[in-house]
Curated annotation (Swiss-Prot):
Gene: rrp4
Pfam families: ECR1_N, KH_6, RRP4_S1
Name the record gives this protein: Exosome complex component rrp4
Organism of this sequence: Schizosaccharomyces pombe (strain 972 / ATCC 24843) (Fission yeast)
Family: Belongs to the RRP4 family.
Residue ranges of domain S1 motif in the record: 110-190
Length: 329
């Protein structure tokens, strides 16, 4: 019996592998040094950094931080042991990654985003929706609710009456459903929270000022609702009781069957109209001063503005500055 031994295989490391091994070794050494110096466990340092960047904007070339434990992200560059801003915008931190989000930039959609859009074009079995991104979003006929909440396949008759659902110029609130390789996205309105917008005022603010949170739909005092979408489109409207009630979904669908695609606004009393105007002015005041837009900031700004009973007084820059200082304290 003859036994054939398999020759040993030798792996020759390439120059890139050697460089990677050296880089990993250096990185491990740096981490060990940081641990010995107490930098890795510096939660207090992270909290202090968050406080220092809160509500702050940076300009190109401005030092963001010189703390060695932070890593640079988009909108920054490393020089002389510090992280500097390469664009004008707001500083954001994810763990120890520091980035600067530009103030003037197109909205970049992400799956699950709550957005407000405007119907730009009606095509066969789909709508093109302007959401403030580089490309229009696509809303398929199969991605909407039919009147009455009926769950069935969309027929040719539905395609023929697409303009009775949405037509050019209509505003809607939807959710980003899918992201395609070319950068375009598809959206859907298959929820009672989404659909055509009525009974309100449309505003446009820089998307960078909208702070992402778990919820972007708020109910304020005075019978006013706000939809603060992440693409920088804001809707201030009359309070919708169905949206915040605990009635069953089936009951709500039956009640909304006739009004879900209506083009007529409901009757709005004068008190609510004034509150809608006041909230709209407050949002514009925050945006014009490059202040972050959140439920808390809008509420504080609104409450501080109540010292001026006349809405015309809110348009005076001096008064707006005073309100902003009180609201952000």
């Amino acid at each position: 019996m003859v036994t054939i031994l398999k020759p040993e295989e030798f792996y020759v490391s390439s120059e890139a592998d050697i460089v990677n091994d050296v880089s990993m070794t250096e990185m491990e050494d740096e981490i060990m040094e940081d641990e010995q110096m107490g930098l890795v466990d510096g939660e207090d340092v992270l909290e202090e950094f968050d406080k220092s960047i809160h509500q702050n904007l940076v300009t190109p070339g401005q030092l963001v931080t010189d703390d060695p434990q932070f890593m640079r992200g988009h909108g920054t560059y490393f020089e002389d042991g510090g992280i500097y801003a390469s664009v004008a915008g707001s500083v954001q931190r994810v763990n120890k990654l520091i980035s600067v989000k530009p103030l003037r930039s197109k909205y970049v959609p992400e799956i699950g985003d709550l957005i407000i859009g405007k119907i730009a074009e009606v095509q066969p079995k789909r709508w093109k929706v302007d959401i403030g991104a580089k490309q229009n979003a696509v809303l398929m006929l199969s991605s909407i609710n039919l009147p009455g909440g009926i769950q069935r396949r969309k027929l040719e008759t539905d395609e023929l009456q697409m303009r009775s659902f949405f037509q050019e110029g209509d505003l809607l609130v939807a959710e980003v459903q899918q992201y395609f390789s070319d950068g375009s996205v598809s959206i859907h309105t298959r929820s009672l929270k989404y659909g055509k917008l009525r009974n309100g005022v449309f505003l446009k603010v820089p998307p960078a000022l909208v702070v992402r949170s778990k919820s972007h739909a708020y109910a304020l005092a005075g019978g006013v609702d706000i939809i603060l979408s992440v693409n920088g489109y804001v809707w201030v409207s009359k309070h919708n009781e169905n949206q915040h009630s605990s009635v069953s979904i089936t009951r709500l669908e039956e009640e909304a069957s006739e009004s879900i695609y209506s083009n007529e606004n409901d009757e709005i009393d004068g008190y609510t109209r004034l509150n809608i105007s006041r909230v709209s002015i407050c949002i514009k005041g925050l945006a014009s001063r490059s202040l972050p837009l959140t439920q808390a900031s809008i509420t504080n700004f609104y409450e501080s503005s109540l010292v001026f009973s006349n809405l015309q007084d809110l348009t005076v820059p001096k008064n707006m500055d005073q309100i902003a200082m009180e609201a952000m304290q």
